[in-house]
Amino acid sequence: MAEQNIDDILSNSEKDTKKWYVIHTASGAENRIKRIMLERISKQKMSDFFDDILVPVFGVSEVKRSKNVKVEKKLMPSYILIKMNMTDKSWHLVKNIPGVTGFLGSKTTPKALTESEIQNIRLETEAKEAKDAKLYEVGEIVTVTEGPFETFTGTVEEVDQEKARLKVSVSIFGKATPIELSFTQVKKND
């Protein structure tokens, strides 16, 4: 497909369908920019030019103060995905938002993403969430990293995601003994 400059894209876009574009933003400002963008689209009555604005995030479990906490992480920090009809007016609306540094592509040619690329991003987000959903699984081998059983290897018998705790069976004097540990007291064996 031949490269088009921004003028060609803008002049032909009235008849084009909406396409996905990637906007580069200031780091950490993605949600604020999305909010401002939605306000400006509404205020300027341009909702016909825009379909969707995505800041791809996934949930991850982190252990903080011995508690399992769900935290949102950005899949693509400093980037926003936007499905829009690229016209001169819509291009300027996006480009003039404070914190937007530009569209992905060259200065004169914003690069449109394919639907399959967008689908891959959505699948990657889902995969990261599914992977995180089970930090530890029953039957998994772990090593105790702190406490009186440090360096002992055992098998996970129970997992309590809410309390961030495990019941691990370790061998003490040749006898399998269950001990309760926090997620921070063990590490997975590779």
UniProtKB/Swiss-Prot annotation:
Domain of life per record: Bacteria
Record domain KOW: where: 138-166
A GO BP entry: regulation of DNA-templated transcription elongation
GO cellular component terms given for this protein: cytosol
Family listed: Belongs to the NusG family.
PANTHER family (UniProt xref): RHO-INTERACTING TRANSCRIPTION TERMINATION FACTOR NUSG, TRANSCRIPTION TERMINATION_ANTITERMINATION PROTEIN NUSG
Function per UniProt: Participates in transcription elongation, termination and antitermination.
Protein name (database record): Transcription termination/antitermination protein NusG
Originating organism: Rickettsia bellii (strain RML369-C)
